[in-house]
Amino acid sequence: GAMNDLFLNTAVIISGHEKVVTRAYEEESQMLPNDLALLDVDQLIINLDKKYPDYFWSPRITFGGLLDIPDKNGETRDQGPVFAIGIDLLGDDSRMSEIWELDKNIVKGRLPQNFDEALISQRLANKLNVSIGDTATYIGTTMYNAFTTYNFPIVGTFDLHKGQADNQMMLVDISGARKALDMENAASEIF
């Protein structure tokens, strides 16, 4: 029982049950190399649905960087590293909230309702002294290795009860991740 839950929960965060990535991305996956991401993802998912109709396929973008929390004057109040995951939270047919059990894991606030809204782990919120309604600025690189900053309003905090796995985690809708990282119709992986 407990071991099955552990393996299932880890599979949800790390990969899903089956995963499609580029060979180059797989070789460098610990570096979160979105410059090696899948392209034309919409068509890839259509093809996967036809070939493997018993599976549920969904794109995901994993990315890391720095999360900057400004004060009332727009100056840095606090900042820290972030591991972020863009999943389909807003799609009509999406099951990501169900698969991730977000409804029962929300500590404060609500689920994102707009593409640019974010959930952060309760631990990260405590570390950065973030409140619901604050804006967090993601600082990182696009899939073309260009410098980027993107503002995500914080609408909720979560605790996935995964120990260190969700210690520095932020969850956003994949459309927000795509906009922040210049990854239109691209994804780190399909799972």
PLM regions with names:
Residues 1-20:
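Alpha-helical transmembrane segments
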Residues 23, 27, 33-185:
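A structural signal for hydrophobic secondary-structure junctions
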Residues 188-190:
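Extracytoplasmic/periplasmic membrane-proximal domains and adjacent transmembrane bundles
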